[in-house]
């Protein structure tokens, strides 16, 4: 063959092939779904390119996939007359994996076969799934519009290298021949192959045909029988579509192996005409947090495929939504640039966003267990919503889930509606605290008074929480209040101070002044507080001061952080505060005050500027 060369696979391909053969063998029939799905994509791409260049059809506009097998040679062939590939495309698509983050993804794989199977499913194996059942794969392809002599041959045993060469191929499209491994004879059985295609490919709009051979007058007559419905699933009436069909269609468009959690199929007529089929996956994709992660919906215009990953129809905080939109209002020659500035796009985006939020609200109401699965997978992404989408902030807030002092569990199961329904009589605000961990939030001294009063506090420990709460200012007419910030509503919760206590506080005024003088401008203010029960002192910030957690976020992002000026609050009923107030020796007094301040700062920030000094002070006072 002309131009023949042997090339090595990209290292990630070798690793993926090894993992796939071992992890997916128990569900090996999916190779046929993957290859037919790829053929369907190739047909979609040809239709789209032919909109501007009809000659690409080469006189054959009847697109299809054909499946045949040869029992003597033990081969199974899947052929399409779609867009095809040239030599460079063959090398790019079949010799490398052009996905950022692939290496780190593969390194995360372990020895847990079930887990690896799910992870590879998220990754999307496509063409390489052929090697699950084949010990050699041969590809013959030609790009639509190219000359017959520009065909390409590709072959590999999947062990580290592949051969590529130039061939003559009269018909456009791609033909993939699987040389089956020993023991895979089930895929040479007509009934078995038919049942797999019916199971996985009924929803594909492209006809899938299987070869029929009949003996007539001593000759073998070959014909092709269509075995799928070949009608785009989203164009069918909802009442006619089974759940299994919706599930399989999801796996086709999302290249996922697991069923979705829920979906919404809608046809809208009137001012705008479109059909949408939107899915919520049951698992987050492996690269959800990758900056280059592609997301968005498949876009069809009047049932003609236009593009994948049309991100213009979903806000970023809903980037996990998969599915498609088929619009009658956009032009067939629409581009990403036109979509960006289109009024139609903006209207569709608004309608689809509301549709997804309604779908999630229904899921939360109808199936709390499934909604918890969703929250564990995508809750962090949804928390971006209040900052990004002010118009739908209340709807997003209803979907948020938190840990709280009411459940005494780190599981984020409490909704804001739950919280409001449990608010005490006269309680005006929704109280929360942000911290580095659930344990730090749960054990914060800021909670002592509220616990004593039986008032619920939301415990927020995700890194995004502090940022989110800057935008989520109220819910159901109730303002949010951080318990780590100074606030009159919290002080009002303290018991009425009796006359004796007032006298005792008055007697401590010189002590407070003494502490102020000692600490100077290191703190914003020193004062007594009744919000503590077991802790001698805390630090708080003013309402307009940057919070500790926000300062940490800035620092983690490498940004300069303004110094946070804390209010130093002392518990007049605590024995350590009383002992410090009674200390006459100035050096000893300084040690006690510094220790109390360091304790308060450590509880608030989790770190100290000079931990060794704190330990020295602690040890010295323990033995004094």
UniProtKB/Swiss-Prot annotation:
PROSITE patterns attached to this UniProt entry: HSP90 (PS00298)
SMART domains, per the entry: HATPase_c
CDD domains in alphabetical order: HATPase_Hsp90-like
Region (A): 1-336
GO cellular component: cytoplasm
Subcellular location: Cytoplasm
One Gene Ontology term of the molecular function aspect: unfolded protein binding
Keyword set, alphabetical order: ATP-binding, Chaperone, Cytoplasm, Nucleotide-binding, Stress response
Binding partners and assembly: Homodimer.
Function: Molecular chaperone. Has ATPase activity.
NCBIfam families: PRK05218.1
Family matches, as HAMAP family: HSP90
Protein name listed in UniProt: Chaperone protein HtpG
Species of the source: Salmonella typhi
């Amino acid at each position: 063959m002309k131009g023949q060369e042997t090339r090595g696979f990209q290292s990630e391909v070798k690793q993926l092939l090894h993992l796939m053969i071992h992890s997916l063998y128990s569900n090996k029939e999916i190779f046929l779904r993957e290859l037919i799905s790829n053929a369907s994509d190739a047909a979609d791409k040809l239709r789209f390119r032919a909109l501007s260049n009809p000659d690409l059809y080469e006189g054959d506009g009847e697109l299809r996939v054909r499946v045949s097998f040869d029992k003597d040679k033990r081969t199974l062939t899947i052929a399409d007359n779609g867009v095809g590939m040239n030599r460079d495309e063959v090398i790019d698509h079949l010799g490398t994996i052009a996905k950022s983050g692939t290496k780190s993804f593969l390194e995360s794989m372990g020895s847990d076969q079930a887990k690896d199977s799910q992870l590879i499913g998220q990754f999307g194996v496509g063409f390489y799934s052929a090697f699950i059942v084949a010990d050699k794969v041969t590809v013959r392809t030609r790009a639509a519009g190219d000359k017959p002599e520009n065909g390409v041959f590709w072959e590999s045993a999947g062990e580290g290298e592949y051969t590529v060469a130039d061939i003559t191929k009269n018909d456009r499209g791609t033909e993939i021949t699987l040389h089956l491994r020993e023991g895979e004879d089930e895929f040479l059985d007509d009934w078995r192959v038919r049942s797999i295609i019916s199971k996985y490919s009924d929803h594909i709009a492209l006809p899938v045909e299987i070869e029929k051979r009949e003996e007539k007058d001593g000759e073998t007559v070959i014909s092709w029988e269509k075995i799928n419905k070949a009608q785009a699933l989203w164009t069918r009436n909802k009442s006619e579509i089974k759940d299994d069909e919706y599930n399989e269609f999801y796996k086709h468009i999302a290249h996922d192996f697991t069923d979705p959690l829920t979906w919404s199929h809608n046809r809208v007529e009137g001012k705008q005409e479109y059909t949408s089929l939107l899915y919520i996956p049951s698992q987050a994709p492996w690269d959800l947090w990758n900056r280059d992660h592609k997301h968005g919906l498949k876009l069809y215009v009047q049932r003609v495929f236009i593009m994948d990953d049309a991100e213009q129809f979903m806000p970023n905080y809903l980037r996990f939504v998969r599915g498609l939109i088929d619009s009658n209002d956009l032009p067939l020659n629409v581009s990403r640039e036109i979509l960006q500035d289109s009024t139609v796009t903006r209207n569709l985006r608004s309608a689809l966003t509301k549709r997804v939020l309604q779908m999630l609200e229904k899921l939360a109401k109808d199936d709390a267990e499934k909604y918890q699965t969703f929250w564990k997978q995508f809750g962090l992404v949804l928390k971006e919503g209040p900052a990004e989408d002010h118009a739908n902030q209340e709807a997003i807030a209803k979907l948020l889930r938190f840990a709280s002092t009411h459940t005494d569990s780190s599981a984020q199961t409490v909704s804001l509606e739950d919280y409001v329904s449990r608010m005490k009589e006269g309680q005006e605000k929704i109280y929360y605290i942000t911290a580095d961990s659930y344990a730090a939030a749960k054990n914060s001294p800021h909670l002592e008074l509220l616990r004593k009063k039986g008032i619920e506090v939301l415990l927020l420990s995700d890194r995004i929480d502090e940022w989110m709460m800057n935008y989520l200012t109220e819910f159901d007419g109730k303002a949010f209040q951080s318990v780590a910030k100074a606030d009159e509503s919290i002080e009002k919760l303290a018991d009425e101070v009796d006359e004796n206590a007032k006298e005792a506080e008055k007697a401590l005024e010189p002590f407070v002044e003494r502490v102020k003088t000692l600490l100077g401008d290191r703190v914003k203010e020193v004062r007594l507080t009744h919000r503590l029960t077991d802790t001698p002192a805390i630090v708080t910030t003013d309402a307009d001061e940057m919070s500790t957690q926000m300062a940490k976020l800035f620092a983690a992002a490498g940004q300069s952080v303004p110094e946070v000026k804390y209010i130093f609050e002392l518990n007049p009923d605590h024995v350590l505060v009383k002992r410090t107030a009674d200390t006459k020796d100035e050096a000893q007094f300084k040690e006690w005050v510094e220790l109390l301040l360091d304790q308060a700062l450590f509880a608030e920030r989790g770190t100290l500027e000079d931990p060794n000094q704190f330990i020295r002070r602690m040890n010295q006072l323990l033995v004094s």
